[in-house]
């Protein structure tokens, strides 16, 4: 195949006005940081008297790498406790490098903090499940995340928090 006649997405984000279709491509995805703590092992690995309480935190960060390329990092942390005693703590920073072309500027933030994390979430979820299982616990299967709700919540809470998610 020939590369003639293609712009490889380097024309910037203005193409949407020219009738070109918006494009979102995952260039790569990777673990930036992974931490697992099992502070009370091996005592915490036996049968528990009660179900652990699991607190899950989710955040999305965006970093502009070029005119069309963005790193989107999905940060997920989970802590399991029984009677205020830590069972495990897992933190994952999982990112993808995305190429976004022909998306109007007013829609760019929503694409980056909703659609991009939605595409990499299943991979991050599997890593968390495998990590907790390898730590001696049942796999932690996080429910699907409502990234639209997270986006709306961030905009309602404070304009400063919403500005932090905008590509820089």
From Swiss-Prot:
| One GO CC annotation | cytoplasm
Do the record's keywords include Transit peptide?
no
Q: Which GO terms describe its molecular function?
A: unfolded protein binding
Question: Bias category Polar residues: which stretches?
Answer: 1-10
Location of this chain's protein in the cell: Cytoplasm
Which residues lie within the region annotated Disordered?
Answer: 1-22
Q: Fetch the InterPro entries from UniProt.
A: SecB (IPR003708), SecB-like_sf (IPR035958)
Q: Which UniProt keywords apply?
A: Chaperone, Cytoplasm, Protein transport, Translocation, Transport
Q: Is the Protein transport keyword given for this protein?
A: yes
Q: Name one GO biological process term.
A: protein tetramerization
Name the predominant localization: cytoplasm
Family statement: Belongs to the SecB family.
* Record function comment: One of the proteins required for the normal export of preproteins out of the cell cytoplasm. It is a molecular chaperone that binds to a subset of precursor proteins, maintaining them in a translocation-competent state. It also specifically binds to its receptor SecA.
What subunit structure does UniProt give? Answer: Homotetramer, a dimer of dimers. One homotetramer interacts with 1 SecA dimer.
This chain belongs to the protein called Protein-export protein SecB
Species, as recorded: Parvibaculum lavamentivorans (strain DS-1 / DSM 13023 / NCIMB 13966)
């Amino acid at each position: 195949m020939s590369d003639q006649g293609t712009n490889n997405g380097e024309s910037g984000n203005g193409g949407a006005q020219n009738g070109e279709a918006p494009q979102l491509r995952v260039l790569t995805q990777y673990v930036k940081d992974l931490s697992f703590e099992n502070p009370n092992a091996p005592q915490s690995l036996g049968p528990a008297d009660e179900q652990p309480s699991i607190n899950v935190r989710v955040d999305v960060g965006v970093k502009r790498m070029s005119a069309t390329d963005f790193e989107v990092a999905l940060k997920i942390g989970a802590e399991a406790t029984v009677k205020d005693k830590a069972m495990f703590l897992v933190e994952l920073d999982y990112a993808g490098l995305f190429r976004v072309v022909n998306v109007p500027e007013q829609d760019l933030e929503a694409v980056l903090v909703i659609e991009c994390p939605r595409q990499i979430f299943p991979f991050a979820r599997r890593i968390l499940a495998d990590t907790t299982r390898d730590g001696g616990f049942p796999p932690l299967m996080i429910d699907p995340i409502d990234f639209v709700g997270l986006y709306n919540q961030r905009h309602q809470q404070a304009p400063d928090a919403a500005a932090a998610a905008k590509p820089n």
